[in-house]
Amino acid sequence: MVSFGGIARKLFGSSNDRRVRSYQPNVAAINSIEEKTKALTDEQLAAKTVEFRALLAEGKTLDDILIPAFAVVREASRRVLGLRPFDVQLIGGMILHSNAIAEMKTGEGKTLVATLPVYLNALSGKGVHVVTVNDYLAQRDAATMGRVYGFLGMTTGVIVHGLSDEERRAAYACDITYATNNELGFDYLRDNMKYEKNQMVQRGHNFAIVDEVDSILVDEARTPLIISGPLDDRSELYNTIDAFIPLLAPSDYEIDEKQRSANFSEEGTEKLENLLRQAGLLKGNALYDIENVAIVHHINNALKAHKLFQRDKDYIVRNDEVVIIDEFTGRMMPGRRYSEGQHQALEAKEKVQIQPENQTLASITFQNYFRMYDKLAGMTGTAQTEAEEFGNIYNLDVIEVPTNLPIKRIDEDDEVYRTFDEKFKAIIEEILDAHKRGQPVLVGTTSIEKSELLAERMRKQGFNDFQVLNARYHEQEAYIVAQAGVPGAVTIATNMAGRGTDIQLGGNLDMRIERELGELEAGPERDARVQAIVEEIKELKQKALAAGGLYVIATERHESRRIDNQLRGRSGRQGDPGRSKFYLSLQDDLMRIFGSDRMDSMLTKLGLKEGEAIVHPWINKALERAQKKVEARNFDIRKNLLKYDDVLNDQRKVIFEQRLELMESTNISETVSDMRREVIEDLVEKHIPERAYAEQWDAVGLKTGVANILNLDLPIEEWFKEEGIGEDDIRERLTQAANAAFTEKAERFGDDIMHYVERSIVMQTLDHLWREHIVNLDHLRSVIGFRGYAQRDPLQEYKSEAFELFTGLLNNLREAVTAQLMRVELVQQAPAEPEPPLMQAHHLDPTTGEDDFAPIYQASEVIVSPENRNPEDPTTWGKVGRNEACPCGSGKKYKHCHGAFEQV
């Protein structure tokens, strides 16, 4: 039955169709001047950049010059790369320019599409950031597309891990900057911990195009970027509490897998109270008394560690460390640690060394970082399922770009079996059948455990001609992905590992050339071998096409339809044939959580025998409904977290703007004077209450406060005894005395030194209090949920109390700065530059799993010139580039020698 909505769409087209059609006149206009643009010489084409900038200076807008600018980029791409953007790619470029997300299928040339709006927006001179998910993609795209920009007279920079501040500053100063989302966020946080404006590396947030936008703005939205410093060791406490959990019976706690939550029952609470009392850890009489909030937090973490987190699914233990497994890619993330003590609870559970907790020095979520840009756009192959989230949180529309060639992939209905064993047996039969036909197969699993279980079963059947791609073997990842499209290849991959690389039928030409000919010098021999590889891949591609193209077999549905669509999208790129199929069982996580019992009884009634599967579109619809529920819940979680984070973000903006003003100022004497005046007003108000009699004035308290804060010994008791004296007189005398003392000190120091001292003390004090404030807000946020039991809105309570804490921070700042400045004295040595503490940065990287929890040092401490490196002492090598020759003298690249151990 066709719905009225379906009939309307057929008659008038969907809103997406209408939006795409609205760009057609511009496409036609660009095509109409193509021949004229082709007739230009290289010099004339490059000169167009100067011409466009002159038009902008005269008052023209970017939209006014879009048509000629896109035509120029298209022609430059054709001349430099041999690639001419198709009409649909022009549409993709216009979508990106109009602050929207372009959904483009795998292999449709997103990287080339980005050059069009990037060039256009870079003409403004304010800088454009192209955001990728890992260093490899940033370097690859900057090197390739930088040739087009360079041809047109524009500069291109790239930001990767390990660059010095000078290198970063130069890259950000370029017209176009390629960088990972992590590097951009960390640079922003580090910039706002600097003490001089000229030390900062970023120059603003004008326009960003985010590649794999769903991964960065959705998958990673719950995890903030954090720069932290170490706290005291509390490993004994973690071990003590961990020992309690095995003593509990199943009736002592409740587990909710859907909500990923764990709570203690009444019996469990009583048992824990006795255990804690015996250990001397319980304060007061009851576990949930306010003074036991920290202990409750530790106990809840321990329970989750034992009952919710599974080894080899959520994490693995490697080299005496608990290493997290990314739920989206199945990759190890050696750099990422769970926050709020959860990682320490897992370390206690696994009896490995417990690493100390870290205090947050600065943090920001990607949601709030990317919302700082004046203009934001994104590209991905899968965004429609999260369109509501992109619209609500980022104000970004999702527009599906038509493919250049029709998609020939066949997406078959799911096959549902009753047990894991039956499902795996059917999967292996299907893999072997496809392998015999010479059809390349990509098998997608949801965890390391499942991928290795499948691999083991295949080996038992005597089949070993396959590759496993997951967190345990990520070093081989690029090559495995490159070979996954070869006829007969069988690749078992955890989730969307290697997402940045296309699986090309016949093999990936660029990767094969780099791997096989990387060390070979340019010349006739290399050219001949390149040509041989090209011919071999052509032949292999024809065989793969004849066998039906890439066959994607999924062993389970993911919680998100988007991840399933990403997996399917690996097949059928650029009009190639392909096939995809999901094999499920009633024992799968998603099926089990969403009511497989009812389905099991239904299948039994229908007479389903062992080894048989049920295949029906209704099953697919039911599973999609379950996935939609999970997606809606996850969206609600992210939306709610953002509401809380917005409170911190508003305060962060105030602090960071204040720091920037301080850095830009050479003289803040007026600010310091205002602080001193307000401190005096607070002192007087505190000790001389409004409308109080003189006998009620607190002379002793005021004298003590003046001595402690203003460092002055004044006859306040005598003043109070004077006839007719009022609080205004007291305030005036205190102000005059403090100003006189400070003026005398300033004259002794001299203007330059005094201004330097004032700025240094204000900034260092502000930083110290801000760090304490972040910790206080974290603690407040962890307990504010309990206010809901009192019928009060936790969010409103959090906003109110966070505001009070922030007001307290500003009061403490005035008081602490005034106290320090009234006491500071010169010593006979050059003033030292204030230094930030030793810092560590970490954040989930769902594509690379690289260590982002590495210490951050000044580059001068990590970059060592080759002549100063001792080949036998790696501690003298400093930072070594991944593609540099290894300093040990082996002749290998660093990443294939000593560098191979960095991610282990």
UniProtKB/Swiss-Prot annotation:
- Residues at which Zn(2+) binds: C886, C888, C897, H898
Q: Localized where?
A: Cell inner membrane; Cytoplasm
- GO biological process terms, semicolon-separated: intracellular protein transmembrane transport; protein import; protein targeting; protein transport by the Sec complex
Coiled-coil stretches, from where to where? none
Principal localisation: membrane
Chemical reaction(s) catalysed: ATP + H2O + cellular proteinSide 1 = ADP + phosphate + cellular proteinSide 2
**SMART domains linked to this entry:** SecA_DEAD, SecA_PP_bind
How are cofactors bound according to the entry's free-text note?
May bind 1 zinc ion per subunit.
A single GO CC term for this protein reads: plasma membrane
One example of the protein's molecular function in GO is: metal ion binding
Question: Which of this chain's residues are annotated to bind ATP?
Answer: Q89, G107, E108, G109, K110, T111, D502
Task: Report the EC number(s), separated by commas if there are several.
Answer: 7.4.2.8
Which Pfam families does the record cross-reference, listed alphabetically? Answer: P-loop_SecA, SEC-C, SecA_DEAD, SecA_PP_bind, SecA_SW
Matches recorded under PROSITE patterns: SECA, SECA_MOTOR_DEAD
Highest taxon of the source?
A: Bacteria
Instruction: Could you list this entry's UniProt keywords, alphabetically sorted.
Output: ATP-binding, Cell inner membrane, Cell membrane, Cytoplasm, Membrane, Metal-binding, Nucleotide-binding, Protein transport, Translocase, Translocation, Transport, Zinc
Bilayer topology annotation: Peripheral membrane protein
Which cofactor(s) are needed, names only?
Zn(2+)
Q: Assembly and partners?
A: Monomer and homodimer. Part of the essential Sec protein translocation apparatus which comprises SecA, SecYEG and auxiliary proteins SecDF-YajC and YidC.
Which protein family is it in? Belongs to the SecA family.
Briefly, what is this protein's role? Part of the Sec protein translocase complex. Interacts with the SecYEG preprotein conducting channel. Has a central role in coupling the hydrolysis of ATP to the transfer of proteins into and across the cell membrane, serving both as a receptor for the preprotein-SecB complex and as an ATP-driven molecular motor driving the stepwise translocation of polypeptide chains across the membrane.
Q: What is this protein called?
A: Protein translocase subunit SecA
Say which species the protein is native to: Rhizobium etli (strain ATCC 51251 / DSM 11541 / JCM 21823 / NBRC 15573 / CFN 42)
Q: What is the lineage of its organism?
A: Bacteria, Pseudomonadati, Pseudomonadota, Alphaproteobacteria, Hyphomicrobiales
Quick one: which gene encodes this?
secA
